[in-house]
Design a protein with these regions (language model features):
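Short secondary-structure boundary/capping elements
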Residues: 2-6, 33, 56-59, 143-146
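Gly/Ser/Thr-enriched, mixed-charge loops and adjacent short helices
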Residues: 1-2, 89-172
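Generic, well-ordered alpha-helical scaffold segments in large soluble proteins
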Residues: 9-13, 44, 48, 67, ...
Length: 173
């Protein structure tokens, strides 16, 4: 319910900004129900006539920011609770500049979310129907490659990296 309510509010705001053709990029992490929440968000947007670009598997939040700009989307959604305990999940919205929403969009979106008081007004559709309509597009390797290429352009000390690239060990916890 919460994901669909938030997404219907976002959809209403996107429509008020004439952004339905630009679309919304959607990413998610490995937390419980992230994939399902991302799919439900996409289908709600699709039912409102808004194109979505949803990653084929989990991606980091910075890649969502990149995808929003690369695909010229009006907005992006990341299903993640970020630094919070793993049993939680969350819903973050980004605007067309790839950054988290700021005024006036933050207030505009929240006003639309709060206005969704009747669940019967929340739209959704079947995934196959959305795909046939060209509203649900799965993205992956092409965006990954473009993202990594852009990251490589930001490397400041390539010589230092080359010196340790075969011996550097990283532990992720």
């Amino acid at each position: 319910y919460t994901v669909r309510q938030a997404t219907q509010g976002l959809a209403n705001y996107v429509l008020s900004q004439n952004g339905q053709e630009k679309g919304v990029a959607i990413a998610y992490d490995s937390r419980r129900m992230s994939t399902e929440f991302a799919t439900e968000a996409a289908l709600c947007l699709n039912a409102n006539g808004i194109k979505t670009y949803i990653f084929d598997s989990l991606r980091p939040t910075p890649e969502l920011s990149f995808a929003v700009r690369e695909l010229h989307c009006i907005a992006g959604i990341v299903i993640t609770a970020s630094h919070n305990p793993r049993e939680y999940n969350g819903y973050k919205v980004y605007w067309e500049d790839g950054a988290q929403i700021t005024p006036p969009h933050d207030k505009g979106i929240m006003d639309e979310v709060k206005a969704v008081t009747d669940f019967a007004t929340v739209k959704t559709m079947e995934k196959e129907e959305a795909k046939k309509a060209g509203l649900y597009e799965v993205i992956g390797a092409a965006i990954d490659d473009a993202y990594i290429a852009e990251l490589k352009k930001l490397v400041v000390h390539q010589d230092a990296i080359n010196q340790v690239k075969d011996t550097l060990k990283i532990v992720y916890t």
